[in-house]
UniProtKB/Swiss-Prot annotation:
Protein family (similarity comment): Belongs to the methyltransferase superfamily. RsmH family.
Main location class: cytoplasm
Protein name, UniProt field: Ribosomal RNA small subunit methyltransferase H
Protein keywords: Cytoplasm, Methyltransferase, rRNA processing, S-adenosyl-L-methionine, Transferase
Organism of derivation: Kosmotoga olearia (strain ATCC BAA-1733 / DSM 21960 / TBF 19.5.1)
Length: 298
């Protein structure tokens, strides 16, 4: 079932991705977060249709959109409804030992934020869900309504980087249970924060808590680390890893892994994260927090 959705997704940092991924004729690439297919399309076009992209996405609804968007490139793509964490199983099923590059564009897609019924957005009143895979067993409502207050506070503190108010937010959530919708959760967060704190923040006051719960529901940081550890084993010498992240926890995970492997299995190509141009941010405000890091197999 494809939900009501009227806004197209704009892939972030496409030119920077091509620069660091360096797609070549006859290359084989894994786009582990296919989304609506924008980066994959750019990779294929950069090689004049002379490469292959294995596209993965855990979200079956988004994958269906990508399949439509990439139908003119069906000879160049193979699409799979799996998490990028399991890319190795896909490669084995295709009898592919090594690839020329891995790309991850981590974060919530425009579709997930805007399509009705997904429960990712604090702007739309709908049931709390936040599962990137609809076959996932744990929803945001499960986390919000069943986790002990202390565990909720830890998640909001660590994953949401809500340093000062994590305990207050967790306490208010527990007081207001059951919380079944996104707006009910927003109201609990609002009640936990002093008015001056809400007005002081540049981003919506619910952003950090929503991020924390989404990361917990989908096991995002653990999955990222697991995939990173496997990537070098499936990269040809000179093959590249390009990761685009949207919050500091993801970026820190990538940075630390690259540093651990620098000179061992990888050579870091970006000593500092690459950020979007001023022009891109003005045209696509969602790009403002994106950071790109890249490394090459040695």
């Amino acid at each position: 079932m494809q939900r009501q959705y009227n806004e197209s997704h704009r892939s972030v940092m496409v030119q920077e991705t091509l620069h660091y991924l360096r797609p070549t004729y006859n290359g084989v690439y894994v786009d582990g977060t296919l989304g609506e297919g924008g980066h994959t399309k750019a990779i294929i076009e950069a090689t004049s249709g002379k490469c292959k992209v294995i596209g993965l996405d855990i979200d079956e609804e988004v994958l269906a959109i990508a399949e439509q968007n990439l139908k003119e490139f069906k000879e160049n793509v193979e699409l799979f409804n799996v998490s990028y964490v399991d890319f190795d199983l896909v490669l084995e099923s295709l009898a592919v030992d090594k690839v020329d590059g891995f790309l991850l564009d981590i974060g919530v897609s425009t579709y997930q934020l805007k399509a009705k019924g997904r429960g990712f957005s604090y702007e739309i009143d709908e049931p709390l869900d936040m599962r990137m895979s609809l076959s996932g067993s744990v929803t945001a409502a499960d986390v919000v309504n069943s986790y002990p207050e202390k565990e909720l506070a830890r998640i909001i503190f660590e994953y949401g980087e809500e340093k000062r108010y994590a305990r207050r937010i967790a306490r208010k959530i527990v007081e207001r249970r059951p919380i079944q919708t996104t707006i009910q959760l927003v109201e609990a967060i609002k009640a936990a924060l002093p008015p001056q704190e809400r007005f002081r923040r540049k981003r919506h006051y619910a952003t950090r808590t929503f991020q924390a719960i989404r990361i917990e529901v989908n096991g995002e940081l653990k999955g990222l680390r697991t995939a990173l550890e496997k990537f070098p084993n499936y990269l040809k010498p000179g093959g590249r890893i390009v990761i685009i992240s949207f919050h500091s926890l993801e970026d820190r995970t990538v940075k630390h892994f690259f540093r651990e492997q620098d000179g061992v299995t990888l050579k870091i190509l970006t000593r500092k994260p690459v950020v979007p141009s001023v022009e891109e941010v003005s045209e696509n405000p969602r790009a403002r927090s994106a950071k790109l890091r890249a490394a090459e197999r040695i």
